[in-house]
Amino acid sequence: MPVSHSISPSPAMIHTADVLCVRDLHFSYPDGHSALHGISFKMNNGEKAALVGPNGAGKSTLMLHLNGILGGHGEVEIGGKRLTRDNLPAIRAMVGLVFQNPDDQLFSPTVFEDVAFGPLHMGLPEEDVRARVEAALEAVRMSGYRDRLSHHLSVGEKKRIAIATVLSMNPSLLVLDEPSAGLDPRARRTLINLLRELPITMLVSTHDMTMVKELFPRTIVMDEGKIVADGSTPEILDDEKLLTEHGLEKP
């Protein structure tokens, strides 16, 4: 059964070609470790891209810059709006970041309260909040879970609820860190089908190269804080020398 398309990018984004634009982004941690070196790339409206590379490549660090959790030197734009301290709340509503561990995202007693948290803090009327929650739960095929206790769910169910918590904000860009990690085959397949059907621009960091091959038309390869390749997924996966040099395996 296809998911509902009631979850869609915010109206301001529909006519914007570049949903995401990163220009010459550099970042070093307080201990002096340099994690990002001149990262630049764009994503178009509706595009789905995989972000791959070995552990320590800088993938998670990059993702934490896209909604302002970390702030380096360079520029990040979402829908033509540059990320600054003044517009940080608006940017965070536009960028739905889903962490690898769903327990980092689910902290309310019930599923409904978790998914409603963002819209409530936007100051929306109760009726609008309920509508957003129902649409988000329907989109991740969890409509019957609204009154369940979040901490009693399976890992796969928690990951879908974590996605719903950001979908309820009607984001323009969905950013996921290792979404298939720790899932059994059935839960993994359910997740892949969900990501395929969601009508939203998507950047997904993953080591699951089989999912990359199946789901993403574009693949960005990172290593040592740099983008070392960016192209069509078939071309990237056919380049065995590239994969070997950067610790990746052909699916």
Residue ranges of predicted features:
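Conserved beta-strand-loop-alpha-helix hinge in the C-terminal portion
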Residues: 226-248
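Catalytic Walker B motif of ABC-type/P-loop ATPase nucleotide-binding domains
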Residues: 174-177
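A short, surface-exposed alpha-helical micro-motif characterized by mixed small hydrophobic
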Residues: 212-214
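Conserved ABC transporter NBD signature motif
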Residues: 74-83, 91
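H-loop/switch region of ABC-family ATPase nucleotide-binding domains
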Residues: 206-207
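Conserved ABC ATPase signature
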Residues: 149-153, 157
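Conserved ABC ATPase "signature" region
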Residues: 127-145
